From Swiss-Prot:
Keyword Nucleotide-binding on entry: no
Subunit structure: Part of the 30S ribosomal subunit.
Any GO molecular function: structural constituent of ribosome
Alphabetic keyword roster: Ribonucleoprotein, Ribosomal protein, RNA-binding, rRNA-binding
Annotated family: Belongs to the universal ribosomal protein uS17 family.
Gene that this polypeptide is encoded by: rpsQ
UniProt entry tagged with the keyword RNA-binding: yes
One Gene Ontology term from the biological process aspect of the record: translation
Protein name: Small ribosomal subunit protein uS17
Length: 78
């Protein structure tokens, strides 16, 4: 099974080698058919502490690194 890749915005970089990435998804409400926005925050591994708050990044699923970290940052978007 391929690893999932998500895009999101860095909302916190205060932890060492960790960033918190907010990923937004949009979907049609099943009854109202209105577009609804939902977001979720993922902790991702940032080995060199190079990503800052506001950066748009891609994160990829990986083996568990800690209790909460199961994602790693692979690239920043231009």
């Amino acid at each position: 099974m391929p690893k999932r890749i998500l895009q999101g915005t860095v909302v916190s970089d205060k932890n060492d080698k960790t960033v918190v990435v907010k990923v937004e998804r949009r979907f049609a409400h099943p009854i109202l058919q209105k577009t609804v926005r939902r977001s979720k925050k993922y902790k991702a591994h940032d080995e060199n502490n190079q990503y800052k708050v506001g950066d748009v990044v891609s994160i990829e699923e990986c083996a568990p690194i800690s209790k909460d970290k199961r994602w790693t940052v692979i690239a920043a978007q231009a």
